[in-house]
């Protein structure tokens, strides 16, 4: 009984890390797949727009990649804590504090990615006519909203990880 309660917090953190990884990977896939082709007619060639053409969407993609890499680096720490039946991730207070500080930095970074995606998408959609936009343009913006939303959920999962880590540190 004591060993299962001892690994309950690290197990919850592992589940949240895996959820964070899945959300960031989904955000990465959605923003990378977001494409738009505008046909202006009149003999002009169609213009293809992807995340590469919009700085904020490139930022969303970059943060998703960085967040995935960071989460993949953190998963072994949690797995070792579970395997050793340690309540505190990292083994010592100093390592746990360092990991919490790193989590805070990356949670804020992921939140800025979500904010950049939401902000630009809202402004661009409003500037180009909002509800009067053609269906393909609306789909382009909605996919960007989806990527930013997934990233925001990942930031929330990281915030929960931080709370659980702090709780295990002070407990």
Curated annotation (Swiss-Prot):
The chain crosses the membrane at residues 12-32, 60-80, 95-115, 146-166. Residues 1-11, 81-94, 167-171 are cytoplasmic. It is a multi-pass membrane protein. It holds the Pfam family CASP_dom. Keywords: Cell membrane, Membrane, Transmembrane, Transmembrane helix. It is found in: Cell membrane. Its main location: membrane. The keyword Cell wall biogenesis/degradation does not apply. PANTHER family: CASP-LIKE PROTEIN 4A4, CASP-LIKE PROTEIN 4D1. This is CASP-like protein 4D1.
């Amino acid at each position: 009984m004591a060993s299962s309660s001892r690994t309950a917090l690290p197990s919850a953190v592992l589940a949240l890390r895996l959820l964070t990884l899945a959300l960031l990977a989904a955000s990465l896939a959605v923003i990378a797949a977001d494409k738009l082709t505008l046909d202006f007619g009149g003999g002009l060639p169609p213009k293809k727009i992807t995340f590469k053409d919009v700085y904020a969407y490139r930022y969303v993609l970059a943060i998703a990649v960085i967040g995935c890499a960071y989460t993949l680096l953190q998963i072994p720490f949690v797995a070792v804590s579970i395997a050793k039946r340690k309540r505190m991730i990292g083994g010592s207070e100093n390592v746990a504090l360092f990991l919490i500080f790193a989590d805070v930095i990356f949670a804020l970074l992921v939140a800025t990615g979500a904010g950049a995606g939401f902000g630009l998408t809202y402004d661009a959609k409003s500037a180009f006519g909002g509800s009067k936009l053609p269906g393909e343009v609306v789909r382009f913006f909605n996919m960007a909203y989806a990527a930013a939303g997934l990233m925001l959920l990942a930031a929330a999962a990281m915030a929960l990880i931080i709370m659980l880590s702090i709780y295990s540190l002070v407990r």
